[in-house]
Amino acid sequence: MRYSHTIERFCGIGKRNGIGYNQADEEKASHLEIHAGEWIEMGYRLFSDMTADVSDELMAGMPTVEFVPMQVELGEENYTYGPEGDLTVEHFYAEQRGGKFASTSQINPMVYRECFEKALKAGEDVLYLCFSSGMSGTLQSANLCAQELREDYPERKVMVVDTLCASVGEAMLVREAARMQHEGLSIDELAAWVEENRLKICHWFTVDTFEHLKHGGRVSAAAAAVGTMLQIKPMLHVDEEGKLRVAEKPRGRKQAIRTQVAHMKAGWTPEMGKLVVVGHGDCPEDGEQLKQAVLKEFPDADVRMANIGPVIGAHTGPGMLALIYWGNNR
């Protein structure tokens, strides 16, 4: 089953340049298609994982990134989430709305080996941008696999970088990394750039219900009951350790959106990048409302939309809204 957007690369399966391009990038897209081998000639492949909630709109015109699949338990069923997996965003949220809870697990080192080894056997190095270590033990699995592969392929580089980001924030960092790779940065230069700039990705999330936060142990049952009664929409952010924290407790959806925009007004640094990402967990109308609120305050912002996938959605549930932008600090 194909993943809900059309990005094709999945551990070496699919088209090298199979993503969609917008009109403005037509000339660049033609160049990429004609010179498809240029991706290989750069000497290394860029990987991330399915926590990075990319979309065609967000990645339009960018060189393709390969995504390592992740496992999601939904109710009593286990799924593989990825472009060639058996779980779509639509099915995931439909099941959640039907009363099922979800959980995720860190990526098995053997899954990493299967993905990375294809590049190494082709004579390419590997740079993997990993889901935040503050939210998962996935980084440990990646480092374990990387060490084994370095021993098996001593002539090749296998580099793992902790993004300290999640969801559409991770996606925005990966997008910029893909662009800079295509512009000619070496694997060492790009790894250093990611480490230097990862904390400049600012994440502000709001959730519509306490139900999934309570189930995941992020809030107590008593706090969830009071918050639900008062119509509180928890405001979460990713801190400098890459951990998801409850920051504020606005009441009602409109106030939550105003709070997100207020944080952006206080911290957005447009000279670092005008790209802003709005993510939504199966609530496109609310996502559009947040997008328009951002554009009203910041008409020059390049606002793009993306779905929040099952990896983060497992812990936040339907109705999550994310606002991601470049800033000097979190």
Task: Spell out what each predicted region is.
Residues 8, 17, 30-32, 90, ...:
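Short non-domain terminal segments
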Residues 39-41, 45-72, 76, 127, ...:
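Mixed-charge interfacial surface used for oligomerization/domain docking
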